Amino acid sequence: MIALIQRVTRASVTVEGEVTGEIGAGLLVLLGVEKDDDEQKANRLCERVLGYRIFSDADGKMNLNVQQAGGSVLVVSQFTLAADTERGMRPSFSKGASPDRAEALYDYFVERCRQQEMNTQTGRFAADMQVSLVNDGPVTFWLQV
């Protein structure tokens, strides 16, 4: 399971002209689900995403996680993160989970975030989405479990 996380000052996702999720300061989480992923990996990745210390403390050091910084989370499904790009000029998606399994794990991940008392907004699974963000820093990390 893969999360591309970006520290943002604001972010939103729009589906068919309707804003489905919007946050102020916090994390934009692009979530990719691979074939061998399961609930255990989703738990671990959620723990890492919410615990990752990439927000500045009073001394300007990256020492606070999103909860400590008072931020929110916007989770957007992103199957292209599971692409195999090692060969050729066209990505292969053979490493990705089936759509049904990916959606179940995406929903599970979102619910785990919410159980941690995080303001968690979402896109719409498998929809054509437009994501807008202001990357703060820029600060972007690839987390994989």
From Swiss-Prot:
One of its GO terms (molecular function) is Ser(Gly)-tRNA(Ala) hydrolase activity. SUPFAM superfamilies: DTD-like. Coiled coil: none annotated. It comes from the Bacteria. Its EC number is 3.1.1.96. It is found in: Cytoplasm. It holds the Pfam family Tyr_Deacylase. It is an enzyme of class 3 (hydrolase). One of its GO terms (biological process) is D-amino acid catabolic process. A motif (Gly-cisPro motif, important for rejection of L-amino acids) lies at residues 137-138. Its main location: cytoplasm. It catalyses: glycyl-tRNA(Ala) + H2O = tRNA(Ala) + glycine + H(+); a D-aminoacyl-tRNA + H2O = a tRNA + a D-alpha-amino acid + H(+). Gene3D superfamilies: D-tyrosyl-tRNA(Tyr) deacylase. Keywords: Cytoplasm, Hydrolase, RNA-binding, tRNA-binding. One of its GO terms (cellular component) is cytoplasm. InterPro entries: Daa-tRNA_deacyls_DTD, DTD-like_sf. Homodimer. Belongs to the DTD family. A Gly-cisPro motif from one monomer fits into the active site of the other monomer to allow specific chiral rejection of L-amino acids. An aminoacyl-tRNA editing enzyme that deacylates mischarged D-aminoacyl-tRNAs. Also deacylates mischarged glycyl-tRNA(Ala), protecting cells against glycine mischarging by AlaRS. Acts via tRNA-based rather than protein-based catalysis; rejects L-amino acids rather than detecting D-amino acids in the active site. By recycling D-aminoacyl-tRNA to D-amino acids and free tRNA molecules, this enzyme counteracts the toxicity associated with the formation of D-aminoacyl-tRNA entities in vivo and helps enforce protein L-homochirality. HAMAP family: Deacylase_Dtd. This is D-aminoacyl-tRNA deacylase.
